[in-house]
């Protein structure tokens, strides 16, 4: 009897303490001790066919800021632009660290750009932004890199058209184009060998299966013990990718040591040049290995930049064209706009043309809204109290702008399931509320490169070719709807015909 009373007393105390904690946060379903809202999230995801519809269900029920408890941890999701701006920009200094997924931190050691915090992350971000500036990101130099790759791929398309009056294009065209651009920035080489690229792309796609709320939050020991195959998939795929990107680094180091290659520290050809130069300088100052500028950090920085720079942009291009071929009127409007400003196609579209292409800009924004690559965004951890909308978020809370939910928020975008370009022309402020690259201090470091790729590739392909669907187009439904990363059906094909 005494044991029962003690047990009931303990449960009562835990529940009362939990209730008091819950009251301080934005509204949400009431959590259970230990498991939080895990059972409710799983049920809603199953019932609604994915994690994104489940999170959108909670938005509709509780508002644009709501709380879900992942076990004993509170997570606050923000799903509108104004509040995201308030929390992650105006109060961004209070929450720049990420909640690191145990399995990914185990794989990376907390090093790099994506799965890192503190001074390590800050130093690598500063280095990357400085290196991009030195390499001409935002200038004609970057534009030339992108256009050289696109022109090379289009020569292959033109050869097909010359033989067959049309070219059949699938997702590989976009994957290889974007993959070669990012590879040229990272290690100065385009992908000449298609099989080499497809191998590394397959590894990234496989690792997406375990990129979900469950795998990213349970302890490593749990995965190793009870789900060893899932642990192995994440571990093996990430390390094989890292081993792949390091092959070029090892080759570069051998060439430097033999005198066959020299680095100009003021004008690096790629990220590897810049990093090796900085590493040498820091080692000379420190008299030994630097804690941040070492080969392990280089490996993780290359991995993170490749992951962030290839899959997201290539997927957006593929999804975008699959949307456009079902809206031929939009393609015609874009082509008319482009022909008008390029003297009837006498020259390529350039980044300087952006202010004069409002229809293309609006179309790209709508494509990015629909493509939304992440179903669940990385949570951050606030180290100071955050106040917004009469709520108080205590230090140590997980908090995120859930961009995927924001992009289907009918309060911001009328009829969000529809593909509608006109709304941005009627209300240009909506362009700012499409935030596929995130918001605040942890926004995508390669945002400028990705935006330039999207504009130049979409624009110049539509300036050169009539694009139509070849057979039926996939629905663009998520292949892994319970994953944190969206992976669309990529079985669709396109027909390119010369204008």
From Swiss-Prot:
Domain of life: Eukaryota
Tissue specificity annotation: Expressed in hypodermis, intestine and vulva upon thiabendazole (TBZ) exposure.
GO BP annotations listed: organic acid metabolic process; xenobiotic metabolic process
Record-listed E.C. numbers: 1.14.-.-
Top-level EC class as recorded in UniProt: oxidoreductase
SUPFAM superfamilies, per database record: Cytochrome P450 (SSF48264)
Database matches in InterPro entries: Cyt_P450 (IPR001128), Cyt_P450_CS (IPR017972), Cyt_P450_E_grp-I (IPR002401), Cyt_P450_sf (IPR036396), Cytochrome_P450_fam2 (IPR050182)
Induction: Up-regulated in hypodermis, intestine and vulva following exposure to specific xenobiotics, such as thiabendazole (TBZ). Expression is up-regulated over 2000-fold by TBZ.
Binding site for heme: 444
Cofactor field: heme
Other comment: Thiabendazole (TBZ) is used as a broad-spectrum anthelmintic to treat parasitic nematode infections in humans and veterinary animals.
Similarity section: Belongs to the cytochrome P450 family.
Chain's role: Cytochromes P450 are a group of heme-thiolate monooxygenases. They oxidize a variety of structurally unrelated compounds, including steroids, fatty acids, and xenobiotics. Involved in the oxidative metabolism of thiabendazole (TBZ). Catalyzes the conversion of TBZ to its hydroxylated form.
Protein name per its UniProtKB record: Probable cytochrome P450 cyp-35D1
Species of origin: Caenorhabditis elegans
Lineage, broadest ranks: Eukaryota, Metazoa, Ecdysozoa, Nematoda, Chromadorea
